[in-house]
């Protein structure tokens, strides 16, 4: 990551990456037992940090609704509601509803990441399509 990247953005990206990886693990691993609960709580924490840290960021889309917040921030609010509902249903042992809320939150995470990577002007897009190619080219040039 760029040394000039603001701390809230680094926190947001790190938490989102952790949530993406932990969520993939949860989807592929067995769904019962202490390990599932432990990884689930870590995923929930990463998702919560991702959502909360988004309020320290501008949308980067040039649009704002209220007090600098945009539709992307509304997704963060919905994500936090989804997390609360998923936890509620897991504790109530209603695993069908738990899975639905979790699947929705994870799909939102993936969709937000795809949008952030695809839209020019966003930090993730710049990292993947500007900074990373520069690093690869510079590293390759040093080999020759």
Model-identified regions with their sequence ranges:
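Alpha-helical membrane insertion/targeting regions
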Residues: 1-144
């Amino acid at each position: 990551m760029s040394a000039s990247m603001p701390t809230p953005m680094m926190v947001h990206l790190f938490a989102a990456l952790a949530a993406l990886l932990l969520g993939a693990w949860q989807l592929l691993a067995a769904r019962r037992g202490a390990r599932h609960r432990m990884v689930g709580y870590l995923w929930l924490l990463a998702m919560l940090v991702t959502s909360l840290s988004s309020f320290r960021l501008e949308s980067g889309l040039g649009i704002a609704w209220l007090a600098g917040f945009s539709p992307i921030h509304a997704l963060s609010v919905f994500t936090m509601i989804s997390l609360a509902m998923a936890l509620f249903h897991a504790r109530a042992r209603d695993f069908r509803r738990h899975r639905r809320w979790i699947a929705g939150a994870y799909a939102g995470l993936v969709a937000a990441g795809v949008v952030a990577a695809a839209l020019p002007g966003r930090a993730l897009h710049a990292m993947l399509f500007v900074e990373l190619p520069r690093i690869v080219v510079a590293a390759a040039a040093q080999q020759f």
